UniProtKB/Swiss-Prot annotation:
PANTHER family: DYNAMIN, INTERFERON-INDUCED GTP-BINDING PROTEIN MX1. Residues 1-20 are annotated as: Disordered. InterPro entries: Dynamin, Dynamin_GTPase, Dynamin_GTPase_CS, Dynamin_N, Dynamin_stalk, G_DYNAMIN_dom, GED, GED_dom. Induction: By type I and type III interferons. It comes from the Eukaryota. CDD domains: DLP_1 (cd08771). Residues 570-658 form the GED domain. This is Interferon-induced GTP-binding protein Mx1. Its main location: cytoplasm. The C-terminal GTPase effector domain (GED) is involved in oligomerization and viral target recognition. The middle domain mediates self-assembly and oligomerization. It is a peripheral membrane protein. Residues 277-280 are annotated as: G5 motif. It is found in: Cytoplasm; Endoplasmic reticulum membrane; Cytoplasm, Perinuclear region. The gene is MX1.
């Protein structure tokens, strides 16, 4: 707190960091006049729950599934990033040359509103350690980095969590990222620059992240890599805050340029800039405490002729920065909570659906395994029944198997129609050829039955191979559909899936052969020219009635040109051909699909279901059949863990007072 003399005291529980977000006025202005207990009550109700909620979700590992609101701290090497974090947290963090931050550090600062003593905790991997003295933090962070990234200069994406609880810290959670390096030095990997940028981009790309860019005042802001990276992912500066450091190192005469940058007049960011003066190396050597450094910082800005205006505007000092960041984080969390809740709900439903595909764990007891296998096979058989009866569930952009088969049957009817729809001229030539070859002692005008019979047999024979081709096409479709059902039900059980697939193939070859035999038998029978008298007479009558209507226009005129008085029987033969073809078409277009449906859908499905039930008889194979893929177990375990995380996250969001 700043006392009436402008001095910062250690004893005040409010610390040097002033609350914002409706709980206090901006730093540098007078404190609000509400009673302290009212302020604490509002603080407990609004500020801490927001940050605790996100911290708890991050601790659950929810960030593995979706992005959480966060403030990421980035900066070039030697930008003063560590000094800023030290000033905010009140603890010494690793310092030195080269890459000091080698793992992302989640810095959780928790303000204690009473006189409780300082306490800290470092967590990483499966390790957790309580810290009772702030001086131990730097050592423990270095140990953690060495354990994760190895001793040296390598970096890692794995998080280290540092929790600091004290009356003298703001309520804030920051993610400290490695400093940006351009050239590998010492034993650093050759691509250390690429590795570092890749790690930083992983965080700053997320729309849920506020980017805190640390830039020294004594460099050209346009040349800093950190700001360039932030602008690349946030070109409008909507979620970027600039932090200017080392104002005491600015060359004389360039102070006004720094003020212009801080006042957002040079490189515009919607969230603007803050400026701070942290402990330098000389201060550390002189053992200047962080509290003393805060007082020195305030004195520096109050006494500086150029930078004093920034203090008056609330843009300067670490306490102002702390309040600003707390306010930004709370606002950002409240803004993103509805979307976060929606994303968690959607992910929960998606993972639940995915987990159902992997089924439940295989029981350990033998009798339970028997029932488990029965359930799996019954579910498979039920899906086969639904498929063969045209009642299976399909997605919005898919169609049922029976619909696909019906389309093939429709194509078959078009093939028949096309083969039988020869033009009159072509038929006349064909009839004339057969008349010249087979006509006996009949007088002109008498129909030669042999000619009629040969033409009909030949036309029907030409349909046999297309019918067999249709059989093979539909058989492949049914086999693929059965295999898909097998995969959907048994994919996690390699042996059961392989056994089922083998049965599907074996039954397919067997029934396809029988169906082809029946189809060829049908076409052999079609070589017997036969039709019920009454049926044929009706068909012939219809053809002749149609013929009479167009006799003057087409048939007679064409016949008079195509045939002489010697071949006056052509029109009669043509009419008989049309009449018989109508009835043959009805038989073939219906009977061939019936054969295919019977063998390739009905019998195929029934035989497969029976063979699957027979697997239950051999108890010795149950363990073998239910042997899971190792990746299936791992995937199911992973999905269950994700589901548990998201379920806890949903419960915590539901309890959040909002």
């Amino acid at each position: 707190m700043v006392n009436s003399k402008g001095k910062i005291t250690d004893s005040d529980p409010g610390s040097s960091h002033l609350l914002l977000n409706g709980l206090a006025d901006k730093a540098g202005k007078n404190q609000d006049t509400e009673p302290e207990n009212s302020l604490c009550s509002q603080y407990e109700e609004k500020v801490r729950p927001c940050i605790d909620l996100i911290d708890s979700l991050r601790a659950l590992g929810v960030e593995q599934d979706l992005a959480l609101p966060a403030i990421a701290v980035i900066g070039d090497q030697s930008s003063g990033k560590s000094s800023v974090l030290e000033a905010l947290s009140g603890v010494a963090l690793p310092r030195g040359s080269g890459i000091v931050t080698r793992c992302p550090l989640v810095l959780k600062l928790k303000k204690l509103l009473n006189k409780d003593e300082w306490r800290g905790k470092v967590s990483y991997q499966d390790f957790e350690m309580e810290i009772s003295d702030p001086s131990e933090v730097e050592v423990e962070i270095n140990k953690a980095q060495n354990a994760i990234a190895g001793e040296g200069q390598g970096i890692s994406h794995e998080l280290i969590s540092l929790e600091v609880s004290s009356p003298h810290v703001p309520d804030l959670t920051l993610i400290d990222l490695p400093g940006i390096t351009r050239v590998a030095v010492g034993n650093q990997p050759a691509d250390i620059g690429h590795q570092t940028k890749k790690l930083i981009k992983k965080y700053i790309l997320k729309q849920e992240t506020i980017n805190l860019v640390v830039v020294p005042c004594n460099v050209d802001i346009a040349t800093t890599e950190a700001l360039s990276m932030a602008q690349e992912v946030d070109p409008d500066g909507d979620r970027t805050i600039g932090i200017l450091t080392k104002p005491d190192l600015v060359d004389r005469g360039t102070e006004s340029k720094v003020v212009d940058v801080a006042q957002n007049l040079v490189c515009h960011l919607k969230k603007g800039y803050m400026i701070v003066k942290c402990r330098g190396q000389q201060d550390i050597q002189d053992q200047v405490t962080l509290t003393e450094a805060l007082q020195k910082e305030r004195d520096f800005f109050e006494d500086h002729p150029h930078f004093r205006v920034l203090l008056e505007e609330g843009r300067a000092t670490v306490p102002c920065l702390a309040d600003r960041l707390t306010s930004e984080l709370i606002t950002h969390i409240c803004k993103t909570l509805p979307l976060l809740e929606k994303q968690i709900k959607e992910n929960y439903e998606k993972i639940t659906e995915e987990l159902q595909k992997y089924g439940s764990d295989v029981p350990e007891e033998e009798h339970e395994k028997m029932f488990f296998l029965i359930e799996k096979i019954n579910a498979f058989n039920h899906d086969i029944t639904s498929l063969t009866e045209g009642e299976e569930f399909v997605g919005e952009d898919e169609c049922r198997l029976f619909t696909k088969i019906r389309n093939e049957f429709h194509k078959w009817s078009l093939v028949i129609e096309k083969r039988f729809q020869q033009g009159y001229k072509a038929i006349c030539k064909q009839i004339e050829r057969f008349e010249n070859r087979y006509r006996g002692r009949e007088l002109p005008g008498f129909v030669n039955y042999k000619t009629f019979e040969i033409i009909i047999k030949q036309q029907i024979k030409e349909l046999e191979e297309p019918a067999v081709y249709m059989l093979h096409t539909i058989t492949d479709m049914v086999q693929a559909a059965f295999t898909d059902i097998s995969e959907a039900n048994f994919a996690e059980f390699f042996n059961l899936y392989r056994t089922t697939k083998s049965k599907i193939e074996d039954i397919k070859f067997e029934l396809e052969k029988e169906a082809e035999k029946s189809i060829r038998l049908h076409f052999q029978m079609e070589q017997i020219v036969y039709c019920q008298d009454q049926v044929y007479q009706c068909a012939l009558q219809r053809v002749r009635e149609e013929s009479d209507k167009e006799k003057d226009k087409k048939i007679n005129s064409m016949c008079s040109k195509e045939v002489s008085s010697v071949n006056i029987s052509l029109s009669d033969i043509f009419e008989h051909l049309l009449a018989y073809r109508q009835e043959a078409t009805n038989r073939i277009s219906s009977h061939i699909p019936l054969i295919i449906q019977y063998f390739i859908l009905q019998v195929y499905g029934q035989k497969l279901q029976k063979d699957m039930l027979l697997l239950l008889h051999d108890k010795d194979t149950h363990n073998w059949l239910l042997k899971e893929r190792s990746d299936t177990r791992d995937k199911r375990k992973l999905l269950k863990e994700r589901l548990a995380r998201l379920a806890q996250a949903r419960r915590r969001l539901a309890k959040f007072p909002g």
